[in-house]
Amino acid sequence: MRRFAIVASQAPASGTFSLNDLPGSGRMDLICRNIGSALLLSHGIRNDAEAIIHLLGGPGKPRRVRFRGIDMTGLRPDERSIAGRIRTVLEEPLPPVGIWKEVSQGISHSGGTLGQTLAEWASDGVIAFRLDRNGSSLDSIHDIPPDVGFLVGDHRPLEAPDLEVAIHSLSLGENWLLGSACISIVHHWLDSQEGNPSPSP
């Protein structure tokens, strides 16, 4: 399973937001692109991937929303459609930290921070990496674990208090890339390592 922990430092964790102004809603447009890159193929949904977005912009406590490809149905690639799924989740009361409550098929939510996600991953045997320009080259990883997770930040660098635990950093090159591009590169690299490179459109 490939897992992506996506940080949304300014996206609302409760209440509502306008589908007509996703950039002004804590850059929800970028978050939706990340989800699309993590889960969608040209003609289907990846059943080997999940994405957890961490909504940290308040009001109230942080909320995590999990999209599981293997259970997902009807996810469309446009940002507005994905944002609508997230907005529906925000209408629900926030579950306790560590308790995942399903809102619709393939989509569930829970309280908690990025540190909670890393703890859950560790409990499940997931090996986690942070995507960072200053990390080791992606090609330096030769033995890919069956369950692997990647942390994807937004415009704000991930700091030690966010992570709560030490984690190895991997670089995709010298330039800062959009999160959605990083996720696509990781998928292509993993597909290639498995002998099944992602086809060109």
PLM regions with names:
Residues 1-132:
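RNA substrate-binding interface of SAM-dependent RNA methyltransferases
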